[in-house]
């Protein structure tokens, strides 16, 4: 399945559910307490992160999608911290604040990137999110997906009211379920239990065949549009009525912390579906996103550039020969990491030592080097009959194998102005005895503040000379 980056900026999502604050106390541990056989942690940093439904909304916003959140909190410092964090991330948050009851806080004591202790401050709320029914109703009119983020803490008590309101508007409903009664999610478009939550409802599954069979029955009984079971190191399984099961392997390279991984899955699904992606594609993106987030410590969100980079790895486009769409994504990601983009172009028909030296010098002008080459038809127009000696595919393959070259792309025109206008490199490099104003594309690059550099060529290194030498040798023989 080929993955691509959705237009998340056109994908508004509403999250309703259990809001909580994940608080971290970071410190050093060098001794055991004289009072009891426990480590002493000297707290050096206190960090607050949105958790639960707030983390789902944060993940959606981090992908670039408009995110709204409705939940229940106390009227306290923790709620203020949540509100400030969410506002800073661009999330529109509406809280029903309950006096004389604390906001749910999960406090984790950390030392040397290890969790030593977790302390929960919580009381189930008697008031649910529908205390803000008018606000929820108004928000539903401007969204494309509704997410129910259920942690069983009391903010979600009237699931069916929310599901019915969304379905009446044609809005898909995604639910991250909790508890022993999944009937409260009847009619949802998709639910995303982990394997343990799933088996709590349907019983143990000895193998994938049994998982698929029991999942199909659950979908039928609850009138679900689809079911996604997340299975940790075994990946995830998507079930849909009248479709074969879709099993996706886990994508994590390293696992540091699974905290919030389920939030990342449902948030990526929601944003992708809101952007118009088909469910299998959205699940593929969610699987990649989960692989990223478990490589981070604590409750974390993934950014759009991180997801783009994962897609590029998946499609083999982190380096090498790229299409224009792939190249533009790669450039966006590189710029998100403050990398300088260098561009050069040519025919590169027979690669020789002069080319290699020149490309190494070009690469030294920045962090990433794009080499754009004329396709076969344009080389023939420029160089005459019998050229190119090597086809465009072979020329690109050889260039892509050089350590100095990051990305290779071809263009059909005689000169690369059209490509330069789209790529907008930071530095345009040309080899030869030119003045800067003679370099093709210098005006384009200069207009947006880019730099043009002319590098000298290695003497006695010329493709034309090599071709002529070969021809003379052939005639002599």
From Swiss-Prot:
Spans annotated as Cytidylyltransferase: 343-477
Catalytic activity, as annotated: D-glycero-beta-D-manno-heptose 7-phosphate + ATP = D-glycero-beta-D-manno-heptose 1,7-bisphosphate + ADP + H(+); D-glycero-beta-D-manno-heptose 1-phosphate + ATP + H(+) = ADP-D-glycero-beta-D-manno-heptose + diphosphate
Keywords linked to the UniProt accession: ATP-binding, Carbohydrate metabolism, Kinase, Multifunctional enzyme, Nucleotide-binding, Nucleotidyltransferase, Transferase
Biological or metabolic pathway of the protein: Nucleotide-sugar biosynthesis; ADP-L-glycero-beta-D-manno-heptose biosynthesis; ADP-L-glycero-beta-D-manno-heptose from D-glycero-beta-D-manno-heptose 7-phosphate: step 1/4; Nucleotide-sugar biosynthesis; ADP-L-glycero-beta-D-manno-heptose biosynthesis; ADP-L-glycero-beta-D-manno-heptose from D-glycero-beta-D-manno-heptose 7-phosphate: step 3/4
Cellular component, GO annotation: cytosol
Superkingdom of the source species: Bacteria
S-adenosyl-L-methionine among keywords: no
Enzyme class: transferase
Annotated positions binding ATP: 194-197
Enzyme Commission no: 2.7.1.167, 2.7.7.70
Sections of the chain in a coiled coil: none
InterPro entries the record matches: Bifunc_HldE, Carboh/pur_kinase_PfkB_CS, Cyt_trans-like, PfkB_dom, RfaE_dom_I, RfaE_dom_II, Ribokinase-like, Rossmann-like_a/b/a_fold
Active-site positions on this chain: 263
BP GO annotations: ADP-L-glycero-beta-D-manno-heptose biosynthetic process
Positions of region (Ribokinase): 1-318
GO molecular function: ATP binding; heptose 7-phosphate kinase activity; heptose-1-phosphate adenylyltransferase activity; phosphotransferase activity, alcohol group as acceptor
Subunit structure and binding partners: Homodimer.
NCBIfam families: cyt_tran_rel, PRK11316.1, rfaE_dom_I, rfaE_dom_II
Described function: Catalyzes the ADP transfer from ATP to D-glycero-beta-D-manno-heptose 1-phosphate, yielding ADP-D-glycero-beta-D-manno-heptose.
Similarity comment: In the N-terminal section; belongs to the carbohydrate kinase PfkB family. In the C-terminal section; belongs to the cytidylyltransferase family.
Name recorded for this polypeptide: Bifunctional protein HldE
